[in-house]
Amino acid sequence: MREFRRVRRVRFAACALVAAATGITLAAGPASADIPIGQKMTGKMTYYTDKGYGACGTPIDASSQDLVAIPAAWWTTPNPNNDPLCRGVSVEVSYNGRTIRVPVRDKCPSCDRTHIDLSQAAFAKLAPLDRGVVNGITWKFVR
């Protein structure tokens, strides 16, 4: 009986430790309310041409569709399909007197917080493709 109680305590302690670690992990990311809707940011844009499924779990073709991949730092859930960014959030991007609005459909793991990766189609509406990287853009999250 005594051995059973010890095993039970060890199991309970292990479960409590896992629960605490999970709680800390989940609490570490910003909540959906922390998406700074409307707050202008200055940064850079690049483009990509991937085809398949984006981080939001929907089919994408970055060579022909208007969309944006957002830096990993803005994603708040372990499963990006469930992330608030995938629920009607777009990005308004301005450069050189032009502005476009593109839906968030993907994640950019190599982008810092102010670097966005536009689809080739969207990038071409703001700058020539041969630029590849454009600094000095402004962008913001919009609904």
UniProtKB/Swiss-Prot annotation:
Assembly behavior: Monomer.
Protein name, entry field: Papain inhibitor
Main location: secreted
Induction line: By heat stress.
GO molecular function, a single term: serine-type endopeptidase inhibitor activity
Its job: Stress protein produced under hyperthermal stress conditions. Serves as a glutamine and lysine donor substrate for transglutaminase. Inhibits the cysteine proteases papain and bromelain as well as the bovine serine protease trypsin. Has hardly any or no effect on subtilisin, bovine chymotrypsin, proteinase K from T.album, transglutaminase-activating metalloproteinase (TAMEP) from S.mobaraensis, dispase from B.polymyxa, thermolysin from B.thermoproteolyticus or collagenase from C.histolyticum.
Leader sequence residues: 1-33
GO terms for biological process, alphabetical: negative regulation of peptidase activity
Entry-linked SUPFAM superfamilies: Barwin-like endoglucanases (SSF50685)
Keyword Secreted: yes
GO cellular component: extracellular space
Organism of provenance: Streptomyces mobaraensis
Compartments it resides in: Secreted
Keyword field: Protease inhibitor, Secreted, Serine protease inhibitor, Signal, Thiol protease inhibitor
